[in-house]
Protein backbone atom coordinates (compact mmCIF):
# COMPACT_ATOMS: atom_id res chain seq x y z
CA UNK A 1 0.00 0.00 0.00
CA UNK A 2 1.25 3.50 -0.84
CA UNK A 3 0.35 6.49 1.32
CA UNK A 4 1.40 9.93 0.12
CA UNK A 5 2.37 12.27 2.98
CA UNK A 6 2.66 15.91 1.87
CA UNK A 7 3.95 18.23 4.59
CA UNK A 8 5.42 21.69 5.05
CA UNK A 9 6.75 24.00 7.74
CA UNK A 10 5.80 27.63 8.22
CA UNK A 11 9.21 29.19 8.79
CA UNK A 12 12.89 28.75 8.00
CA UNK A 13 14.39 25.96 10.07
CA UNK A 14 17.71 26.63 11.81
CA UNK A 15 20.37 24.72 9.92
CA UNK A 16 22.71 22.28 11.62
CA UNK A 17 26.05 21.07 10.37
CA UNK A 18 26.94 17.49 9.53
CA UNK A 19 28.29 16.89 13.04
CA UNK A 20 24.85 17.33 14.61
CA UNK A 21 23.54 14.19 16.30
CA UNK A 22 20.15 14.19 14.62
CA UNK A 23 17.40 16.00 12.84
CA UNK A 24 16.01 19.28 14.17
CA UNK A 25 12.29 18.80 14.86
CA UNK A 26 10.57 22.18 14.82
CA UNK A 27 7.20 21.13 16.25
CA UNK A 28 4.67 18.40 16.92
CA UNK A 29 3.27 18.35 13.39
CA UNK A 30 6.77 17.91 11.95
CA UNK A 31 7.52 15.13 14.43
CA UNK A 32 4.30 13.32 13.51
CA UNK A 33 5.34 13.32 9.85
CA UNK A 34 8.83 12.07 10.70
CA UNK A 35 7.42 9.30 12.92
CA UNK A 36 5.15 8.14 10.09
CA UNK A 37 8.03 8.15 7.63
CA UNK A 38 10.28 6.17 9.98
CA UNK A 39 7.80 3.58 11.23
CA UNK A 40 4.88 3.00 8.87
CA UNK A 41 5.26 0.88 5.74
CA UNK A 42 4.28 2.55 2.49
CA UNK A 43 4.66 6.17 3.59
CA UNK A 44 5.90 8.44 0.78
CA UNK A 45 6.89 11.85 2.20
CA UNK A 46 6.52 14.87 -0.07
CA UNK A 47 8.23 17.98 1.28
CA UNK A 48 6.69 21.33 0.40
CA UNK A 49 9.56 23.78 0.74
CA UNK A 50 9.44 27.46 1.57
CA UNK A 51 10.42 28.13 -2.04
CA UNK A 52 7.57 25.93 -3.33
CA UNK A 53 5.09 27.99 -1.33
CA UNK A 54 6.57 31.31 -2.39
CA UNK A 55 6.42 30.22 -6.05
CA UNK A 56 2.86 28.87 -5.65
CA UNK A 57 4.03 25.40 -6.60
CA UNK A 58 2.44 23.40 -3.76
CA UNK A 59 -0.31 21.88 -5.90
CA UNK A 60 2.09 21.08 -8.73
CA UNK A 61 4.56 19.35 -6.39
CA UNK A 62 1.82 17.14 -4.93
CA UNK A 63 0.23 16.47 -8.33
CA UNK A 64 3.62 15.40 -9.73
CA UNK A 65 4.11 13.08 -6.74
CA UNK A 66 0.69 11.52 -7.36
CA UNK A 67 1.57 10.93 -11.02
CA UNK A 68 4.90 9.39 -10.05
CA UNK A 69 3.76 7.13 -7.20
CA UNK A 70 0.04 6.43 -7.92
CA UNK A 71 -0.77 6.33 -4.17
CA UNK A 72 -3.69 4.44 -2.65
CA UNK A 73 -4.44 7.42 -0.40
CA UNK A 74 -3.17 10.77 0.81
CA UNK A 75 -2.63 11.45 4.51
CA UNK A 76 -2.34 15.13 5.36
CA UNK A 77 -2.51 17.28 8.47
CA UNK A 78 -3.13 20.73 7.01
CA UNK A 79 -6.91 21.22 6.75
CA UNK A 80 -6.40 24.43 4.77
CA UNK A 81 -5.22 22.25 1.90
CA UNK A 82 -8.64 20.59 1.78
CA UNK A 83 -9.96 21.97 -1.54
CA UNK A 84 -6.68 21.16 -3.24
CA UNK A 85 -6.63 17.66 -1.75
CA UNK A 86 -10.21 16.92 -2.79
CA UNK A 87 -9.39 17.98 -6.35
CA UNK A 88 -6.90 15.09 -6.72
CA UNK A 89 -9.66 12.42 -6.47
CA UNK A 90 -7.50 10.25 -4.22
CA UNK A 91 -8.89 8.79 -0.95
CA UNK A 92 -8.01 11.13 1.93
CA UNK A 93 -7.15 10.94 5.62
CA UNK A 94 -7.01 14.27 7.46
CA UNK A 95 -5.32 14.43 10.87
CA UNK A 96 -6.45 17.48 12.84
CA UNK A 97 -3.51 18.78 14.87
CA UNK A 98 -4.85 22.32 15.18
CA UNK A 99 -4.57 23.76 18.70
CA UNK A 100 -7.31 25.27 20.83
CA UNK A 101 -6.98 28.79 19.46
CA UNK A 102 -9.35 31.45 18.17
CA UNK A 103 -7.81 33.32 15.28
CA UNK A 104 -8.82 34.41 11.80
CA UNK A 105 -7.71 31.09 10.27
CA UNK A 106 -10.30 29.23 12.30
CA UNK A 107 -13.33 31.15 10.99
CA UNK A 108 -13.83 28.78 8.06
CA UNK A 109 -12.51 25.63 9.74
CA UNK A 110 -15.94 24.20 10.53
CA UNK A 111 -17.00 24.53 6.88
CA UNK A 112 -13.71 22.99 5.75
CA UNK A 113 -14.20 19.96 8.01
CA UNK A 114 -17.84 19.59 6.97
CA UNK A 115 -16.88 19.61 3.28
CA UNK A 116 -14.09 17.09 3.91
CA UNK A 117 -16.51 14.82 5.74
CA UNK A 118 -19.07 15.12 2.94
CA UNK A 119 -16.39 14.18 0.40
CA UNK A 120 -15.68 10.89 2.19
CA UNK A 121 -12.42 11.99 3.80
CA UNK A 122 -11.64 10.22 7.07
CA UNK A 123 -11.05 12.84 9.78
CA UNK A 124 -9.20 12.11 13.01
CA UNK A 125 -8.57 14.45 15.95
CA UNK A 126 -5.87 14.04 18.60
CA UNK A 127 -7.84 14.63 21.81
CA UNK A 128 -11.43 14.92 23.06
CA UNK A 129 -10.75 18.43 24.42
CA UNK A 130 -9.58 19.50 20.97
CA UNK A 131 -12.66 18.02 19.28
CA UNK A 132 -15.06 19.66 21.73
CA UNK A 133 -13.34 23.03 21.30
CA UNK A 134 -13.55 22.99 17.51
CA UNK A 135 -17.11 21.64 17.46
CA UNK A 136 -18.24 24.47 19.72
CA UNK A 137 -16.32 27.09 17.76
CA UNK A 138 -17.70 25.94 14.40
CA UNK A 139 -21.23 26.04 15.80
CA UNK A 140 -20.78 29.44 17.41
CA UNK A 141 -19.02 31.23 14.53
CA UNK A 142 -20.70 29.75 11.45
CA UNK A 143 -23.53 27.62 12.89
CA UNK A 144 -21.84 24.61 11.29
CA UNK A 145 -21.90 21.00 12.42
CA UNK A 146 -19.10 19.15 10.66
CA UNK A 147 -20.35 15.68 11.53
CA UNK A 148 -18.87 12.53 13.02
CA UNK A 149 -15.15 11.92 13.01
CA UNK A 150 -13.51 8.51 12.65
CA UNK A 151 -11.74 8.66 16.00
CA UNK A 152 -8.67 9.92 17.83
CA UNK A 153 -4.99 9.41 17.05
CA UNK A 154 -2.09 9.92 19.41
CA UNK A 155 0.31 12.09 17.41
CA UNK A 156 3.41 10.37 18.76
CA UNK A 157 4.88 7.53 20.82
CA UNK A 158 7.85 6.77 23.07
CA UNK A 159 10.74 4.71 21.63
CA UNK A 160 12.43 2.01 23.68
CA UNK A 161 15.62 4.05 24.12
CA UNK A 162 14.14 7.04 25.96
CA UNK A 163 16.84 8.52 28.21
CA UNK A 164 16.59 8.44 31.98
CA UNK A 165 18.95 10.37 34.25
CA UNK A 166 19.67 10.76 37.94
CA UNK A 167 22.17 13.53 37.16
CA UNK A 168 19.74 16.43 37.33
CA UNK A 169 21.05 19.83 36.21
CA UNK A 170 17.95 21.95 35.66
CA UNK A 171 15.22 22.69 38.16
CA UNK A 172 12.70 23.20 35.36
CA UNK A 173 12.83 23.02 31.57
CA UNK A 174 10.49 23.59 28.66
CA UNK A 175 10.45 23.11 24.90
CA UNK A 176 8.52 25.25 22.47
CA UNK A 177 8.54 27.08 19.19
CA UNK A 178 9.72 30.64 19.77
CA UNK A 179 6.50 32.60 19.46
CA UNK A 180 4.47 34.75 21.81
CA UNK A 181 1.55 32.29 21.96
CA UNK A 182 3.61 29.26 23.00
CA UNK A 183 5.72 31.62 25.15
CA UNK A 184 8.49 29.19 26.15
CA UNK A 185 10.38 32.02 27.87
CA UNK A 186 7.57 32.32 30.38
CA UNK A 187 9.50 30.05 32.76
CA UNK A 188 12.48 32.42 32.62
CA UNK A 189 10.21 35.38 33.27
CA UNK A 190 8.50 33.68 36.21
CA UNK A 191 11.87 32.86 37.80
CA UNK A 192 13.71 36.08 36.98
CA UNK A 193 13.93 37.00 40.68
CA UNK A 194 15.16 33.57 41.76
CA UNK A 195 18.93 33.31 42.04
CA UNK A 196 19.28 29.63 42.88
CA UNK A 197 16.90 27.88 40.45
CA UNK A 198 18.21 26.87 37.02
CA UNK A 199 15.67 27.05 34.19
CA UNK A 200 16.18 25.83 30.62
CA UNK A 201 14.30 26.90 27.48
CA UNK A 202 14.86 24.87 24.31
CA UNK A 203 13.52 26.64 21.25
CA UNK A 204 14.30 27.81 17.73
CA UNK A 205 15.10 31.14 16.11
CA UNK A 206 12.63 30.87 13.26
CA UNK A 207 11.85 33.62 10.78
CA UNK A 208 8.09 34.11 10.78
CA UNK A 209 5.57 36.02 8.69
CA UNK A 210 4.32 37.82 11.80
CA UNK A 211 6.28 40.84 13.03
CA UNK A 212 4.82 40.26 16.49
CA UNK A 213 6.33 36.79 16.64
CA UNK A 214 9.64 37.99 15.20
CA UNK A 215 9.71 40.67 17.90
CA UNK A 216 9.22 37.94 20.51
CA UNK A 217 12.23 36.09 19.10
CA UNK A 218 14.40 39.21 19.29
CA UNK A 219 13.13 40.25 22.72
CA UNK A 220 14.29 36.97 24.26
CA UNK A 221 17.92 36.94 23.18
CA UNK A 222 19.17 38.46 26.42
CA UNK A 223 18.73 35.67 28.97
CA UNK A 224 21.86 34.50 30.81
CA UNK A 225 22.59 31.92 33.52
CA UNK A 226 20.83 30.69 35.54
CA UNK A 227 18.26 31.27 32.76
CA UNK A 228 19.68 28.85 30.21
CA UNK A 229 18.59 28.91 26.56
CA UNK A 230 19.44 26.42 23.81
CA UNK A 231 18.36 26.97 20.22
CA UNK A 232 18.04 24.67 17.23
CA UNK A 233 19.01 21.46 19.01
CA UNK A 234 18.53 18.09 17.33
CA UNK A 235 15.60 16.20 18.79
CA UNK A 236 17.86 13.62 20.46
CA UNK A 237 19.66 16.35 22.42
CA UNK A 238 16.39 17.98 23.42
CA UNK A 239 15.27 14.72 25.01
CA UNK A 240 18.59 14.30 26.81
CA UNK A 241 18.25 17.74 28.40
CA UNK A 242 14.64 17.11 29.38
CA UNK A 243 15.71 13.93 31.17
CA UNK A 244 18.15 15.95 33.30
CA UNK A 245 15.42 18.26 34.58
CA UNK A 246 13.77 17.95 37.98
CA UNK A 247 10.49 19.21 36.53
CA UNK A 248 9.20 19.91 33.01
CA UNK A 249 6.70 22.68 32.24
CA UNK A 250 4.22 22.94 29.37
CA UNK A 251 3.64 26.69 29.06
CA UNK A 252 0.80 26.73 26.51
CA UNK A 253 -2.75 25.96 27.71
CA UNK A 254 -4.01 25.62 24.11
CA UNK A 255 -2.07 22.52 23.10
CA UNK A 256 -4.10 20.03 21.10
CA UNK A 257 -2.33 17.07 22.76
CA UNK A 258 1.24 17.65 23.99
CA UNK A 259 4.11 15.61 22.53
CA UNK A 260 6.79 17.22 24.69
CA UNK A 261 4.74 16.55 27.82
CA UNK A 262 4.63 12.88 26.82
CA UNK A 263 8.38 12.86 26.19
CA UNK A 264 9.11 14.48 29.54
CA UNK A 265 6.94 11.98 31.41
CA UNK A 266 8.57 9.19 29.41
CA UNK A 267 11.92 10.35 30.79
CA UNK A 268 10.47 10.14 34.30
CA UNK A 269 10.18 13.91 34.67
CA UNK A 270 7.12 15.16 36.60
CA UNK A 271 5.32 17.79 34.57
CA UNK A 272 3.69 21.13 35.32
CA UNK A 273 0.82 22.03 32.99
CA UNK A 274 -0.01 25.73 32.70
CA UNK A 275 -3.74 26.19 32.23
CA UNK A 276 -6.05 29.02 31.31
CA UNK A 277 -8.98 30.16 33.42
CA UNK A 278 -10.91 26.96 32.59
CA UNK A 279 -8.27 24.89 34.45
CA UNK A 280 -7.97 22.49 31.47
CA UNK A 281 -4.90 21.34 29.58
CA UNK A 282 -5.14 18.80 26.74
CA UNK A 283 -1.93 17.10 27.93
CA UNK A 284 -3.78 15.74 30.94
CA UNK A 285 -4.81 12.85 28.68
CA UNK A 286 -1.15 12.03 28.04
CA UNK A 287 -0.19 11.15 31.61
CA UNK A 288 -0.45 7.59 32.88
CA UNK A 289 -1.52 8.83 36.33
CA UNK A 290 -3.12 12.02 37.63
CA UNK A 291 -0.37 12.27 40.22
CA UNK A 292 2.33 12.63 37.55
CA UNK A 293 1.39 16.20 36.65
CA UNK A 294 0.48 19.39 38.46
CA UNK A 295 -1.76 22.13 37.05
CA UNK A 296 -1.14 25.82 37.67
CA UNK A 297 -2.73 28.88 36.10
CA UNK A 298 -0.54 30.57 33.51
CA UNK A 299 -1.18 33.92 35.23
CA UNK A 300 0.40 32.72 38.48
CA UNK A 301 2.91 34.94 40.23
CA UNK A 302 6.62 34.28 40.04
CA UNK A 303 6.63 33.29 43.70
CA UNK A 304 3.81 30.80 43.18
CA UNK A 305 5.54 29.24 40.19
CA UNK A 306 8.86 29.01 42.05
CA UNK A 307 7.19 27.32 45.02
CA UNK A 308 5.43 24.86 42.71
CA UNK A 309 8.68 23.94 40.96
CA UNK A 310 10.48 23.37 44.26
CA UNK A 311 7.74 21.42 46.02
CA UNK A 312 6.66 19.27 43.06
CA UNK A 313 10.27 18.28 42.37
CA UNK A 314 10.73 17.19 45.98
CA UNK A 315 7.40 15.35 46.12
CA UNK A 316 8.10 13.36 42.95
CA UNK A 317 11.84 12.80 43.46
CA UNK A 318 11.47 9.12 44.33
CA UNK A 319 8.76 8.40 41.76
CA UNK A 320 10.66 9.14 38.57
CA UNK A 321 11.10 5.42 37.80
CA UNK A 322 7.35 4.91 38.16
CA UNK A 323 6.55 7.89 35.92
CA UNK A 324 8.89 6.66 33.19
CA UNK A 325 7.72 3.04 33.29
CA UNK A 326 4.00 3.79 33.27
CA UNK A 327 4.23 6.44 30.56
CA UNK A 328 6.37 4.27 28.28
CA UNK A 329 3.89 1.44 28.60
CA UNK A 330 0.95 3.70 27.76
CA UNK A 331 2.69 5.25 24.73
CA UNK A 332 4.70 2.38 23.27
CA UNK A 333 5.62 2.25 19.60
CA UNK A 334 3.70 -1.00 19.16
CA UNK A 335 0.43 0.56 20.41
CA UNK A 336 0.90 3.68 18.28
CA UNK A 337 1.80 1.71 15.17
CA UNK A 338 -1.17 -0.61 15.64
CA UNK A 339 -3.53 2.36 15.68
CA UNK A 340 -1.97 4.04 12.63
CA UNK A 341 -2.13 0.76 10.71
CA UNK A 342 -5.78 0.45 11.68
CA UNK A 343 -6.49 4.00 10.45
CA UNK A 344 -4.86 3.22 7.11
CA UNK A 345 -6.59 -0.15 6.74
CA UNK A 346 -9.95 1.41 7.56
CA UNK A 347 -9.46 4.06 4.90
CA UNK A 348 -8.36 1.45 2.39
CA UNK A 349 -11.41 -0.71 2.88
CA UNK A 350 -13.72 2.25 3.58
CA UNK A 351 -16.36 -0.06 5.02
CA UNK A 352 -17.09 1.87 8.20
CA UNK A 353 -18.90 5.15 7.50
CA UNK A 354 -19.46 6.04 11.16
CA UNK A 355 -17.27 6.74 14.12
CA UNK A 356 -14.95 3.81 14.69
CA UNK A 357 -13.72 2.24 17.89
CA UNK A 358 -10.52 4.28 17.58
CA UNK A 359 -12.31 6.64 19.96
CA UNK A 360 -11.53 4.18 22.74
CA UNK A 361 -8.23 2.90 21.39
CA UNK A 362 -6.01 5.34 23.29
CA UNK A 363 -7.88 5.64 26.58
Across the structure, where does each feature detected by a protein language model lie?
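Short alpha-helical donor nucleotide-sugar binding micro-motif in glycosyltransferases
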Residues: 239-245
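Aromatic "clamp/platform" in nucleotide-sugar-dependent glycosyltransferases that forms part
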Residues: 253
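A charged, aromatic-enriched C-terminal amphipathic alpha-helix characteristic of glycosyltransferases
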Residues: 28-31, 36, 299-304, 314-363
Amino acid sequence: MKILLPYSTHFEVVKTDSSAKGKVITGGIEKFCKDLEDNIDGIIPVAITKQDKENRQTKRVIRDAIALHDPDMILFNNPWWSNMMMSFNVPLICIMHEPLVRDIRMVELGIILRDLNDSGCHIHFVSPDQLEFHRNMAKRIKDVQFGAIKGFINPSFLPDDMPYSSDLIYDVSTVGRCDNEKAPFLIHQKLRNSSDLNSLVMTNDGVYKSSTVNDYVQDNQHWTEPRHTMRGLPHSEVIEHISRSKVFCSTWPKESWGITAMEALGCGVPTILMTGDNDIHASEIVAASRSHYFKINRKCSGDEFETTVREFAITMKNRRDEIAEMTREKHSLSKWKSCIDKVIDMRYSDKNKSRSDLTEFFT
